[in-house]
């Protein structure tokens, strides 16, 4: 996974997330939508063949937090949820 910043402003961030596809892109977008300070979060895959594993994201906040902070919080939520799934799985197979 590699992040390439395209545009950065006070409450806007556009970037490519190289090495990922719709699976992680959807998860990240939906998690960003849970943040009350995120006014827009979305992604596109510009070409289904040549850019299939390089979604382009746009994150806009209300200015109370930065888009970078919103991404940090979303990444932590995803990590925490994955840990919960792992723990539930371990409990189920014991």
From Swiss-Prot:
It is found in: Cytoplasm. GO terms for cellular component: cytoplasm; DNA-directed RNA polymerase complex. It catalyses: RNA(n) + a ribonucleoside 5'-triphosphate = RNA(n+1) + diphosphate. Its main location: cytoplasm. Its EC number is 2.7.7.6. It is an enzyme of class 2 (transferase). PROSITE patterns: RNA_POL_L_13KD. InterPro entries: RBP11-like (IPR036603), RBP11-like_dimer (IPR009025), RNA_pol_Rpb11_13-16kDa_CS (IPR008193), Rpo11-like (IPR022905). Pfam families: RNA_pol_L_2. GO terms for molecular function: DNA binding; DNA-directed RNA polymerase activity; protein dimerization activity. SUPFAM superfamilies: RBP11-like subunits of RNA polymerase. GO terms for biological process: DNA-templated transcription. Keywords: Cytoplasm, DNA-directed RNA polymerase, Nucleotidyltransferase, Transcription, Transferase. Part of the RNA polymerase complex. DNA-dependent RNA polymerase (RNAP) catalyzes the transcription of DNA into RNA using the four ribonucleoside triphosphates as substrates. Belongs to the archaeal Rpo11/eukaryotic RPB11/RPC19 RNA polymerase subunit family. This is DNA-directed RNA polymerase subunit Rpo11. The lineage of its organism: Archaea, Methanobacteriati, Methanobacteriota, Thermococci, Thermococcales.
């Amino acid at each position: 996974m590699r992040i390439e910043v395209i545009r950065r402003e006070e409450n806007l961030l556009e970037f490519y997330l190289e090495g990922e596809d719709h699976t992680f892109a959807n998860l990240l977008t939906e998690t960003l939508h849970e943040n009350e300070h995120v006014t827009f979060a979305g992604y596109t895959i510009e070409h289904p063949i040549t850019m299939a594993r390089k979604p382009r994201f746009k994150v806009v906040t209300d200015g109370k937090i930065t888009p970078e902070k919103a991404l940090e919080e979303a990444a932590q939520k995803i990590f925490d949820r994955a840990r919960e799934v792992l723990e539930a799985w371990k409990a189920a197979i014991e």
